[in-house]
A protein has these predicted regions:
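Bacterial Sec-dependent N-terminal signal peptides
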Residues: 1-26
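Beta-strand elements of repeat-based all-beta scaffolds
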Residues: 21-576, 582-584
Length: 584
């Protein structure tokens, strides 16, 4: 069992009273809720997580609204100051989400996890009256989303809106060309357009009024994506064959210059609907060949075709890639791969492809091996190349995992041999790899109970046996946020590389580098968009709806100011965009 995913779920009613978790008394209030406890330390049983016994854990409480929805989520004591981070939800009579309040840190008096009225607290914390995302729906049984109003006083009255319609030949913006795929796989533009109403249309408009249409066919496949810039349309068409496979993508450039070679994405399939041909705009096509088990065994791009080369992939009986490389097989020979199952069998002795021990069941002409993989065991240690480095035997079962590999270094005849070792939770705890010029690199990793790395010890040994070590140490807070990274070289004093501090919403607030000599502060707006970076040598402010530029409410940066040093003259830039969001 993966201990990182063990979660305790408890359905609690009003009679359940108080529970203890994460050294806090959790009051489930007078409502029905679900208590979720994720352990951060080793524990003796599920019941121990609900007691104050020193076992650290992450505790969440979800309160239901009585109709299957969640009315409030509380992350107990998760903020840097140990406050509850609380967010609330409201639904309409049909069960659709109608309002979502921004998460707000709330200091609990005596107990944590109790249901709270947080609207006023959120308004005070953010300094905005508009702290709820609101959703408006179509008044029908379909309950289609019509408008989404975001948070922030600057966005009051502004929404991301949707309109639902269909294709209409009489209205230019809702007119769609009809492309077909011929029996021979060629693109054909039909003389007869789509019948009115045969395509489902959705018009989206962001907070700045930029409009985007999408049209879908009866199979719910996207047929046309249309972006508007005034009266100019930027159309991307998607063309499917009779089996529903995407065959052509025709971007806006193709509409002005209908050249498939320069502007189109082209895909072709075999009789089993496997992709066998792929061509990107302006590029030579790539070919893909599969074996009888539907696994990719050969591929070729334009550059390889000029040199009569194919990439090949050999698999074991479990479908895992064991050998990768290039070969000089003829096109006719490659095509016959689909008639068989290409397998790599591990043989005894230093035989097979690149002396790896793997023998392909399909003949390869002049194979050049780039990657060899071994799985499940460490029997490869005695094979050619590995035996020179004395790789240790694994002490924990690695069944199902990659245990060793050989990597060919381009431009030389050298190989890099490596092995990975796991703990009982299938995490890599030691990784060893040889070096082309001799010697070894070893990485040993220690993990927390939850699976976060606590330390990584790197040992570099040269060909003469001389070793150097460096250790990275990672520290986390009570909510598993990374707070410190330290580095130690050999036996020298440890150096604090970086120290992170976070605000009450979990956003990175300050970075301190090199034992705190250099510090950088970060600022955000109510939508969590980065608005400022402040350091001793450099500062920068990003403006969206304020500043000197034209206000942008959709997330584009309208202007930027910066300066280097405390007394430097501020400088800045203003940005403008077209309706496609492109910088102009």
């Amino acid at each position: 069992m993966n201990i990182k995913r063990i979660i305790v779920l408890v359905l609690i009613s009003a009679s359940s009273g108080l529970l203890c978790a994460q050294r806090k008394t959790v009051n489930m209030s007078d409502r029905y809720g679900i208590l979720t406890v994720t352990p951060l330390d080793k524990y003796t049983g599920a019941a121990s997580l609900l007691k104050t016994n020193g076992v650290r854990s992450l505790t969440d409480v979800s309160y239901g609204d009585g109709f299957g929805g969640v009315s409030q989520k509380i992350h107990v004591g998760i903020t840097p100051q140990g406050k509850d981070l609380t967010e609330s939800y409201e639904y309409n009579s049909l069960g659709n989400l109608q309002s979502r309040t921004l998460p707000v840190p709330v200091l609990s008096e005596g107990t944590s996890g109790n249901y709270k009225q947080i609207l006023k607290s959120a308004q005070e914390y953010y300094g905005h009256s508009n702290v709820c995302s609101r959703f408006a729906y179509e008044a029908s049984h379909r309950s289609l989303l019509l408008k989404e109003f975001g948070v922030g006083d600057e966005w009051t009255g502004k929404a991301v809106s949707k309109k639902y319609s269909c294709n209409l030949e009489s209205i230019p913006v809702q007119r769609c060309k009809r492309y077909l795929v011929s029996a021979g796989g060629e693109l054909v533009e039909s003389d007869s357009p789509y019948a009115d109403g045969s395509l489902r249309g959705i018009r989206s408009e962001d907070e700045d009024g930029n409009m985007h249409w999408e049209f879908y066919n009866s199979e719910n496949q996207l047929v046309l994506s249309r972006i508007l810039d005034g009266d100019t349309f930027f159309d991307t068409y998607f063309v499917y064959d009779e089996y529903g496979n995407l065959v052509f993508v025709l971007p806006p450039g193709y509409q002005d210059h209908p050249d498939l070679d320069l502007y189109a994405y082209i895909y072709r399939y075999d009789y089993l609907d496997r992709l066998v041909y792929k061509k990107l705009p302006g590029c030579a096509p790539s070919y893909l060949v599969y074996d009888a088990a539907h696994r990719l065994v050969f591929s070729q791009d334009g550059c390889q075709r000029n040199d009569s080369l194919w990439s090949f992939f050999v698999y074991d009986v479990y479908g895992r890639v064991v050998v990768e490389g290039e070969c000089s097989n003829s096109d006719k020979h490659v095509r016959t791969a689909g008639e068989t199952v290409v397998l790599g069998t591990l043989m005894e002795g230093d035989t097979g492809l690149a002396y790896s021990g793997y023998q392909s069941s399909f003949d390869l002409v002049d194979p050049c091996v780039y990657v060899v993989n071994y799985y499940d065991t460490y029997d490869f240690r005695t094979r050619n190349g590995f035996s020179a480095y004395n790789f240790p035997e694994g002490t924990v079962s690695a069944t199902g995992n990659l245990t060793g590999s050989i990597l060919c270094t381009h431009g030389s005849s050298g190989f890099i041999y490596s092995a990975d070792y796991y703990d009982i939770n299938k995490r890599i705890v030691k990784s060893l790899s040889s070096r082309v010029n001799g010697g070894m690199d070893t990485y040993a990793t220690e993990y927390s109970f939850q699976g976060s790395p606590l330390s990584v010890l790197h040992t570099h040994t040269d060909s003469s046996g001389y070793s150097l070590t460096e250790r990275y140490t990672y520290t986390y807070d009570h909510s598993s946020r990374l707070t410190r990274v330290s580095h130690q070289y050999d036996n020298n004093p440890s150096v604090l590389l970086v120290e992170h501090t976070y605000d009450e919403l979990g956003r990175l607030q300050t970075d301190k580098l090199d034992n705190g000599i250099y510090a950088t502060d970060y600022a955000y707006n109510i939508r969590n968009w980065l608005t400022g970076i402040e350091g001793g040598k450099f500062s920068q402010s990003l403006h969206y709806t304020d500043g000197l530029g034209v206000p942008c409410y959709n997330g584009n940066i309208s202007s930027m100011t910066w300066k280097s040093g405390a007394g430097a003259t501020p400088r800045g830039y203003k940005f403008s965009y077209d309706r496609l969001g492109r910088l102009t």
